[in-house]
Regions:
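N-terminal accessory segments
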Residues: 1-32, 61-64, 299-317, 408-409, ...
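Conserved, mostly hydrophobic/aromatic
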Residues: 59, 381, 447
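N-terminal flexible segment immediately upstream of the FAD-binding catalytic core
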Residues: 1-57, 73-105, 134, 255-266, ...
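FAD-binding subdomain of flavoenzyme oxidoreductases
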Residues: 96-251, 452
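Activity-critical C-terminal alpha-helical subdomain
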Residues: 175, 424-459
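C-terminal substrate-recognition/cap domain of FAD-linked oxidoreductases
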Residues: 20-29, 215, 226-229, 234-398, ...
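Glycine-rich tight-turn/loop motif centered on a GG-T
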Residues: 38-45, 87, 106, 336-344, ...
Length: 459
């Protein structure tokens, strides 16, 4: 619990309507998408950068833990207050789009802006912000930067880090820094903005983001390839991507995911398929679209594709992407709890990774539906637990073997979900002692009292 003097300070600073210690608010901010619960000591909603600075300065002086929070949509516990402390939420007030500069193709936003809302606003100006995580309708841009969120457009357009031009960040001691510039080129000084991206709130609190925008492509079209064997689908991915065609998206669902989506939504997916690939291309003329789809179909069929369907209208387009976006919730038919992680490997290693997952599934007796962003090698593996109390420990062992498989294939523990709490103990699998010490020293230099989001990322 917070001492009375701390409670009074925060109430005086932001007002009683923006600081809470009652159980209702603490319960509302004690969990994220992992469904784990850790009760904070208080919840505060700063109105501006100055208040963030004063909050952090005070907390640093009094050694009070601060957990920055966007929408709480993360899958790794990054926004959980595991040892009490103060949840600093940006969703209530810091949700404004400050500027959309159509001449320079940049935008300035506050960290609480919802990703999908931002996309909609820039599209009104025929502009395009590509990063589109599955949580786009809930997640904040500040959270996206803190996790380096990806999405389905990553195959062609990259991920959040590719669009962050500059940040304003409040450090643990309350000091405010600028990192990066509005310019396309900037090699003056260290890349501090790059350090803050994917730092999960451990190094500072983001108060403003400058993002790069693109001109919106006028045309797009999607298609689905059907494969009897998942290995064929994975081979088709890297061979297509290395052929000169660059699809906007290259997504997959395995057989278990297909069946789950069909059981829940009946979208007409081929339930007996080993896997499907859902792809999208864009361009400025119809001939460009047609050529890309023709090339993709050619490479798919050369690698075992037994059916190729091009979406002919908006409804078919929406149905394809609805199926992919709702795969995560659909697989709940296989168990009461899922261990959901997002390992990433080089694209050519996808067949080997999925083979290892199949072996681990058989070894432990778990259903492990997989889907994800194969265009950038990012696979969402989901270990389904029918009896969480009985199976949790065994499930963690199975997931550790999946992590080991990804690392052995020169991959990584996480492509976009981050490390947070759920993967913190596995960091030594991916990094040696010297590398982990470097991370800890960076953390200590910027947050010597360890008040910002402690225990995350294995730090």
């Amino acid at each position: 619990m917070l001492e009375k003097q701390h409670i009074q300070y925060f109430k005086n600073l932001v007002g009683g309507e923006d600081f809470f210690t009652d159980l209702a608010h603490l319960n509302a901010y004690c969990y994220d998408a992992t469904k784990e619960r850790h009760l904070p000591s208080g919840v505060i909603f700063p109105k501006n950068e100055r208040e963030i600075s004063q909050i952090l300065k005070y907390c640093n002086e009094h050694r009070l833990i601060v957990v920055p929070r966007g929408a709480g949509s993360g899958f790794t516990g990054g926004a959980l207050s595991v040892s009490g402390g103060l949840v600093l939420s940006v969703e209530k007030h810091l949700d404004k789009i400050l500027e959309i500069d159509t001449k320079n193709l940049i935008a300035r936003v506050e960290p609480g802006v919802i990703n999908k809302h931002f996309q909609n606003e820039v599209e009104k100006l025929d502009l395009f912000y590509p990063p589109d995580p599955a949580s786009e309708s809930q997640s904040t841009l500040g959270g996206n930067v803190a996790e380096n969120a990806g999405g389905m457009c990553a195959a062609k357009y990259g991920i959040t880090k590719d669009y962050v031009m500059a940040l304003r960040v409040v450090l643990a001691n309350g000091e405010i820094i600028r990192a990066g510039k509005k310019t396309i080129k900037d090699v003056a000084g260290f890349n501090v903005a790059g350090l803050m991206i994917a730092s999960e709130g451990c190094l500072g609190v983001i108060s403003e983001i400058t993002l790069k925008l693109l001109a919106k492509p006028p045309l797009k079209q999607s298609a689905m390839g059907v494969f009897n064997h998942i290995e064929d689908a994975m081979n088709a991915v890297y061979k297509t991507m290395s052929s000169g065609v660059t699809p906007v998206a290259m997504e997959f669902l395995d057989n278990l995911s297909i069946k789950a989506v069909e059981e829940r939504f009946s979208k007409g997916l081929p339930k007996e398929a080993g896997a499907i690939l859902i792809t999208q291309v864009d361009g400025v003329v119809k001939e460009q679209i047609a050529w890309q789809l023709n090339e993709i179909e050619k490479h798919f069929k050369a690698n075992g594709c037994v059916g190729f369907k091009i979406a002919q209208n908006e409804q078919e387009e929406q149905d394809l992407w609805f199926s992919r976006r709702n795969a995560s919730q659909s697989i709940s038919v296989y168990g009461k709890k899922k261990l959901n992680e997002d390992v990433t490997v080089p694209r050519a290693s996808l067949p080997s990774l999925l083979q290892e997952v199949a072996k681990i599934s058989q070894k432990y007796g778990f259903k492990i539906p997989c889907f994800g962003h194969t265009g950038d090698g990012n696979v969402h593996v989901n270990i389904m637990l029918e009896d969480p109390k009985r199976d949790l420990e065994k499930g963690h062992k199975a997931m550790e073997e999946i992590f080991q498989a990804a690392i052995s294939l020169e991959g990584t523990l996480s492509g976009e979900h981050g490390i947070g709490l759920s993967k913190a103990k596995f960091m030594p699998l991916a990094f040696n002692h010297s590398e982990m010490e470097l991370f800890r020293n960076i953390k200590k230099a910027l947050d010597p009292n360890n008040i910002l989001n402690p225990f995350k990322m294995g730090l």
